[in-house]
């Protein structure tokens, strides 16, 4: 039988004490290193190469990853690959979840929860917006005076967003007689909006819904006609200007202008005195 010397026992005791007295931050560091090492074992997906020849302006090149494009976003092979990429990212970042949560809460804590915009007069009313508490979306209001003594809510996006994973509003625009308001809503995050018309005197929506638009209208002075821009379903480029009369189906709308040059964006605006409507174009290459 082996006999342990006093020296050996003393050395063992010191080693145990040394291990027990490690600083907390050092122990935490080692834990992170272990978790990181586990994350590294995740295998990154490798996209296959499928040569695709493309010729533009007389120049031919090979795009090995062209197969990853699917404008309809339905190809199972592409979806499976993207899911594998996401799974790999989740695995590699798993050890940072607590840190992510901590950073998120810290950043939220810096946000001013209650905020109001400066009222701006348009027609007979002063329009403004506000955010309150933990609400994710804006509430839009109007009042007959700058101080907001008779302030009324004309659109509460928090209410509209209920039941949707994503929701965005754009292009709020009130009719010249201050009675109707048009706005666009997007529930899929494609920046393609369905335009709604709200009667501000009753708070109810009209039956009119204009689909596939850029999200805003320009009102004609008759308070019953709106002009809007329709987007291409694949390129998402706004290129057609339509005229819609309230109370009629969108299929009856009249095409006013169509831009065939895909290098230009199409926009609309109204003159300051309200007498004219402009159709304009812009391009990053022009």
Predicted regions: what is each one?
Residues 8-9, 19-286:
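Beta-propeller folds
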């Amino acid at each position: 039988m082996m006999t342990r010397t006093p020296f050996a026992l003393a050395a063992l005791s010191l080693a145990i004490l040394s291990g027990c007295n490690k600083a907390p931050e050092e122990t935490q560091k080692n834990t992170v290193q272990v978790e990181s090492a586990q994350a590294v074992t995740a295998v990154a997906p490798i996209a296959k190469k499928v040569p695709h020849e493309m010729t533009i302006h007389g120049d031919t090149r090979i795009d090995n990853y062209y197969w990853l494009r699917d404008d309809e976003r339905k190809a199972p092979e592409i979806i499976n690959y993207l899911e594998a990429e996401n799974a790999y990212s989740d695995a590699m970042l798993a050890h940072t979840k607590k840190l992510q949560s901590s950073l998120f809460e810290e950043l939220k804590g810096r946000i001013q929860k209650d905020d109001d915009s400066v009222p701006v007069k348009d027609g007979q009313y002063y329009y403004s917006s506000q955010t309150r508490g933990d609400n994710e979306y804006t509430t839009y209001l109007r009042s007959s005076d700058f101080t907001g003594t008779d302030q009324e809510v004309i659109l509460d996006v928090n209410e509209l967003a209920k039941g949707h994973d994503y929701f965005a509003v754009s292009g709020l625009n009130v009719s010249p007689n201050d009675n109707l308001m048009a706005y666009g809503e997007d529930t899929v995050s494609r920046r393609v909006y369905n335009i709604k018309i709200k009667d501000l005197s009753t708070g109810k929506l009209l039956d009119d819904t204009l689909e596939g638009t850029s999200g805003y209208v320009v009102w004609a002075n008759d308070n019953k006609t709106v002009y809007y821009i329709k987007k291409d379903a694949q390129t998402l480029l706004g290129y057609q200007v339509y005229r819609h009369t309230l109370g009629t189906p969108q299929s009856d709308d009249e095409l006013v202008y169509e831009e065939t040059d895909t290098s230009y964006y199409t926009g609309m605006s109204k003159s300051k005195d309200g007498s004219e409507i402009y159709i304009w174009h812009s391009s990053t290459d022009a």
